[in-house]
Amino acid sequence: MFRKQNLKWLGVLATIIMTFVQLGGALVTKTGSEDGCGSSWPLCNGALLPENLPIQTIIELSHRAVSAISLIVVLWLVITAWKNIGYIKEIKPLSIISVGFLLVQALVGAAAVIWQQNPYVLALHFGISLISFSSVFLMTLIIFSIDKKYEADILFIHKPLRILTWLMAIIVYLTIYTGALVRHTKSSLAYGAWPIPFDDIVPHNAHDWVQFSHRGMAFITFIWIMITFIHAIKNYSDNRTVRYGYTASFILVILQVITGALSVITNVNLIIALFHALFITYLFGMIAYFILLMLRTTRSLK
């Protein structure tokens, strides 16, 4: 027998596990554990469970295990949602995207282990995983909105905010790519002091340019989200969905900037780096939700 409450718990579980997949990937990169299992995949150093287990191997194995569990739980969520609430227009496309990108994410990760891809390709891995996470996150939000306690179904987003939000999505995604590139090119401590080394502003090598590009994109992201937030609060003050959503996004980008700065100041403290990955994960999830609302608005115009 289908119960909405069970589906809600399943959605929350899937979202939490997908969050740990994101954090696990960041942990693997930050600790240099990419080669913890050698060039073996899905085995680890040629065995299901190798005898020698240094910390890098444990981290890589744990990430693979959580990724495998996430696939099972997401499939469970997708099948249950498709069967019971598939009449909701977004459920089936989101189901396909969540599973599809989860598989692509796994294949890119496997290719990185087996063939040692260059950092510019590896940087795509985090962005792909964020799309999968966001699909699961959106499904969970839709499941919770079934009881009609929210105003999202009757929300109409006008063109100015739609344009600002679409541009925000593009800018944030580019910033995410440059951030992943910083990790994969080992450029976290390049380009000197934060926000810029005033005594030596011009980047000198590829690592400096990667870090410089990410800081520049992060600055643009912060300014653009602030502009979008001000517009949303000013013009949609009577709508809780917009007010809370864009406020949450602005808070998340502030936290993202703070943890980014602290990462440089503390020489990439691991806990701060993981919070940096966590905040951008949920910021992207919020932007994905705004896109969902905008698509509903566009559909209502036809």
Curated annotation (Swiss-Prot):
<feature type="transmembrane region" description="Helical">
    <location>
        <begin position="94"/>
        <end position="114"/>
    </location>
</feature>
<feature type="topological domain" description="Extracellular">
    <location>
        <begin position="183"/>
        <end position="215"/>
    </location>
</feature>
<feature type="transmembrane region" description="Helical">
    <location>
        <begin position="216"/>
        <end position="236"/>
    </location>
</feature>
<comment type="similarity">
    <text>Belongs to the COX15/CtaA family. Type 1 subfamily.</text>
</comment>
<feature type="topological domain" description="Cytoplasmic">
    <location>
        <begin position="292"/>
        <end position="302"/>
    </location>
</feature>
<feature type="transmembrane region" description="Helical">
    <location>
        <begin position="68"/>
        <end position="88"/>
    </location>
</feature>
<dbReference type="InterPro" id="IPR050450">
    <property type="entry name" value="COX15/CtaA_HemeA_synthase"/>
</dbReference>
<keyword id="KW-0408">Iron</keyword>
<feature type="binding site" description="axial binding residue">
    <location>
        <position position="276"/>
    </location>
    <ligand>
        <name>heme b</name>
    </ligand>
</feature>
<feature type="binding site" description="axial binding residue">
    <location>
        <position position="63"/>
    </location>
    <ligand>
        <name>heme o</name>
    </ligand>
</feature>
<keyword id="KW-1015">Disulfide bond</keyword>
<feature type="transmembrane region" description="Helical">
    <location>
        <begin position="126"/>
        <end position="146"/>
    </location>
</feature>
<dbReference type="GO" id="GO:0016653">
    <property type="term" value="F:oxidoreductase activity, acting on NAD(P)H, heme protein as acceptor"/>
</dbReference>
<keyword id="KW-0479">Metal-binding</keyword>
<keyword id="KW-0560">Oxidoreductase</keyword>
<comment type="pathway">
    <text>Porphyrin-containing compound metabolism; heme A biosynthesis; heme A from heme O: step 1/1.</text>
</comment>
<feature type="binding site" description="axial binding residue">
    <location>
        <position position="125"/>
    </location>
    <ligand>
        <name>heme o</name>
    </ligand>
</feature>
<keyword id="KW-0472">Membrane</keyword>
<dbReference type="GO" id="GO:0006784">
    <property type="term" value="P:heme A biosynthetic process"/>
</dbReference>
<feature type="topological domain" description="Extracellular">
    <location>
        <begin position="266"/>
        <end position="270"/>
    </location>
</feature>
<feature type="topological domain" description="Cytoplasmic">
    <location>
        <begin position="237"/>
        <end position="244"/>
    </location>
</feature>
<dbReference type="InterPro" id="IPR023755">
    <property type="entry name" value="HemeA_Synthase_type1"/>
</dbReference>
<dbReference type="GO" id="GO:0046872">
    <property type="term" value="F:metal ion binding"/>
</dbReference>
<feature type="transmembrane region" description="Helical">
    <location>
        <begin position="245"/>
        <end position="265"/>
    </location>
</feature>
<feature type="binding site" description="axial binding residue">
    <location>
        <position position="214"/>
    </location>
    <ligand>
        <name>heme b</name>
    </ligand>
</feature>
<feature type="disulfide bond" description="Essential for catalytic activity">
    <location>
        <begin position="37"/>
        <end position="44"/>
    </location>
</feature>
<feature type="topological domain" description="Cytoplasmic">
    <location>
        <begin position="89"/>
        <end position="93"/>
    </location>
</feature>
<comment type="subunit">
    <text>Interacts with CtaB.</text>
</comment>
<comment type="function">
    <text>Catalyzes the conversion of heme O to heme A by two successive hydroxylations of the methyl group at C8. The first hydroxylation forms heme I, the second hydroxylation results in an unstable dihydroxymethyl group, which spontaneously dehydrates, resulting in the formyl group of heme A.</text>
</comment>
<feature type="topological domain" description="Extracellular">
    <location>
        <begin position="115"/>
        <end position="125"/>
    </location>
</feature>
<keyword id="KW-0812">Transmembrane</keyword>
<keyword id="KW-0350">Heme biosynthesis</keyword>
<feature type="topological domain" description="Cytoplasmic">
    <location>
        <begin position="147"/>
        <end position="161"/>
    </location>
</feature>
<dbReference type="Pfam" id="PF02628">
    <property type="entry name" value="COX15-CtaA"/>
</dbReference>
<dbReference type="GO" id="GO:0005886">
    <property type="term" value="C:plasma membrane"/>
</dbReference>
<protein>
    <recommendedName>
        <fullName>Heme A synthase</fullName>
        <ecNumber>1.17.99.9</ecNumber>
    </recommendedName>
</protein>
<feature type="active site">
    <location>
        <position position="60"/>
    </location>
</feature>
<dbReference type="InterPro" id="IPR003780">
    <property type="entry name" value="COX15/CtaA_fam"/>
</dbReference>
<feature type="topological domain" description="Extracellular">
    <location>
        <begin position="30"/>
        <end position="67"/>
    </location>
</feature>
<keyword id="KW-1133">Transmembrane helix</keyword>
<feature type="topological domain" description="Cytoplasmic">
    <location>
        <begin position="1"/>
        <end position="8"/>
    </location>
</feature>
<keyword id="KW-1003">Cell membrane</keyword>
